[in-house]
Amino acid sequence: MPALRSRTTTHGRNMAGARALWRATGMTDDDFGKPIVAVANSFTEFVPGHVHLRNLGSLVAGAVAEAGGVAREFNTIAVDDGIAMGHGGMLYSLPSRELIADSVEYMVNAHCADALVCISNCDKITPGMLLAALRLNIPTVFVSGGAMESGNAVISGGTARSRLDLITAMSAAVNPDVSDGDLSTIERSACPTCGSCSGMFTANSMNCLTEAIGLSLPGNGSTLATAAARRELFVEAGRLVVDLARRYYEKDDEAVLPRSIATAAAFRNAFAVDVAMGGSTNTVLHLLAAAVEAGVDVTLADIDQISRTVPCLCKVAPSSTRYYMEDVHRAGGIPAILGELDRAGLLDPDPHTVHSASLREFLDRWDVRGPSPSPDAIELFHAAPGGVRTIEPFSSTNRWDTLDTDARDGCIRSVEHAYSAEGGLAVLFGNLAVEGAVVKTAGVDEGQWTFRGPALVVESQEEAVDAILTGRVKAGNVIIVRYEGPRGGPGMQEMLYPTAFLKGRGLGPKCALITDGRFSGGSSGLSIGHVSPEAAHGGTIALVRDGDIIEIDIPARRLELVVSDEELASRRAALEAAGGYRPTGRERPVSMALRAYAAMATSASTGAARDVGLLGG
């Protein structure tokens, strides 16, 4: 039976100094011997998805104490990708994932904590904490801050825009048909509450996937930040983590540990949910990195196989203007998606979770479309938006009159009525992406699933934006944005502004954008990212020239540069003779912190996970 890790600092004559310091934090003799639970909060006033988390660590801590544990809270950093977007700040977004993972590891191991509650929410915070949890492998429960309500506005002439979000504002900003007054109205209405942005963007996608993989409670992915029902998730997380700690340290039950939960089967289930719900392409990056920490062998080819067999059951903003996270919740949330996949035989029902002995047991209680959902499930998924601008969590007691259980035309469809027979994410291969590239097919009109056009090559996101706004980009172009990968950026920027500006200029359905960088979860259209190898690693994307023909075939999973092997070899030799794989004419300050990240960054095809072996020695 494993001893409490915290005994290292709380027991023995030689630890008198450590105990003295623990006492200075408020601990007493009675606390030495209880499991110490690290509460990793991510409160910050910079991020709407985290602005309401200030007091929620105390809520968890109170529940931990009532259950017989001792909670100690600390904070991590949290970058707002939307505010960091479109300028040099975006270089820091993906690297912050590694800093968050490291900071959680540092705090937990430095203080010998026994268990962990991760209070996360937005884009890189949930993934960073997930990497840490799998690395530490101590009893852990995730609870996120919850989704933002969708916006609404009345613009000129009384025209109502009933559903708005951040992307609406970005696209409207470059649409010449939108007046300054209307733009101001949209801007002020797009993000009405605290919480992670209201669509199936990266933050909400990842919070849904912690639920699918089994490390958070039912409803974690879809319950709104403003919903009173969300409060119980924080309280239950505190109770549950103490129970998990007792099972491990007192009963030697290793089944409660993150790596025992996030098994290969659990990862396959999570990827099935991901492609079924049309999650952000960033989820592929983050789950691949998490698999590395979990010691699970998952490749892009595996994900591609899942995407070919699992249909798209759910289209939420930005893939649809009809549905937002509040609608996913009303339709039963992640348990409903899992249930539809389970009934179609597309899931492994055996993996257990932090709260249930198996996925099947989980669904028996929490799938509102199943034969006998629990009263708790029915109550939870009735939680509705408040419709009031606020940054207060749990402020809405509104309830939907009915649940959306329409499997034919509702927010979450059955396999028989799927949006498409294949999933909402796809992996493409070809001479332009030998190791793979990722596209969110749920956000691409089927008329664009095959596309052929001349390349317009730019060496940075900034140049791409300039090309769009100055009219260099024409209908039919395939925009190639290169040297924006994990090393080449460095930091693998998101291309939300280029995709939003294409949409705003009416070019979204008429162009394609291909990059070795990333796309925001808010991006839609024919946006192909994570091209691997990246340009800075000698990938074929470095050899593309203006006017080269690019062929995209999503059904065939193909991404090709229509240039002969002989010509490509000639171009490669010339490029290497000229000094190698570096952007031309780009001036970009790169700090020491970013250089350190670049030195250890691996390919997007392996989740851009760090490899210290790249440092040598």
From Swiss-Prot:
Residues the entry annotates as binding [2Fe-2S] cluster: C122, C197
Cystine residue pairs: none
Keyword Kinase part of the UniProt annotation: no
Pfam families: ILV_EDD_C (PF24877), ILVD_EDD_N (PF00920)
Cofactor(s) it depends on: [2Fe-2S] cluster; Mg(2+)
Pathway field: Amino-acid biosynthesis; L-isoleucine biosynthesis; L-isoleucine from 2-oxobutanoate: step 3/4; Amino-acid biosynthesis; L-valine biosynthesis; L-valine from pyruvate: step 3/4
Active site: S520 (proton acceptor)
Listed GO MF terms: 2 iron, 2 sulfur cluster binding; dihydroxy-acid dehydratase activity; magnesium ion binding
Cellular component annotations (GO), alphabetically ordered: cytosol
Reaction(s) catalysed (UniProt annotation): (2R)-2,3-dihydroxy-3-methylbutanoate = 3-methyl-2-oxobutanoate + H2O; (2R,3R)-2,3-dihydroxy-3-methylpentanoate = (S)-3-methyl-2-oxopentanoate + H2O
Keywords per UniProt: 2Fe-2S, Amino-acid biosynthesis, Branched-chain amino acid biosynthesis, Iron, Iron-sulfur, Lyase, Magnesium, Metal-binding
Chain sites annotated for binding Mg(2+): D81, D123, K124, E494
E.C. number(s) listed in UniProt: 4.2.1.9
GO biological process, one term: isoleucine biosynthetic process
UniProt xrefs under PANTHER family: D-XYLONATE DEHYDRATASE, D-XYLONATE DEHYDRATASE YAGF-RELATED
HAMAP family: IlvD
Function text: Functions in the biosynthesis of branched-chain amino acids. Catalyzes the dehydration of (2R,3R)-2,3-dihydroxy-3-methylpentanoate (2,3-dihydroxy-3-methylvalerate) into 2-oxo-3-methylpentanoate (2-oxo-3-methylvalerate) and of (2R)-2,3-dihydroxy-3-methylbutanoate (2,3-dihydroxyisovalerate) into 2-oxo-3-methylbutanoate (2-oxoisovalerate), the penultimate precursor to L-isoleucine and L-valine, respectively.
Quaternary assembly: Homodimer.
Family assignment from sequence similarity: Belongs to the IlvD/Edd family.
NCBIfam families hit by this protein: ilvD, PRK12448.1
Protein name, UniProt field: Dihydroxy-acid dehydratase
Annotated source species: Frankia casuarinae (strain DSM 45818 / CECT 9043 / HFP020203 / CcI3)
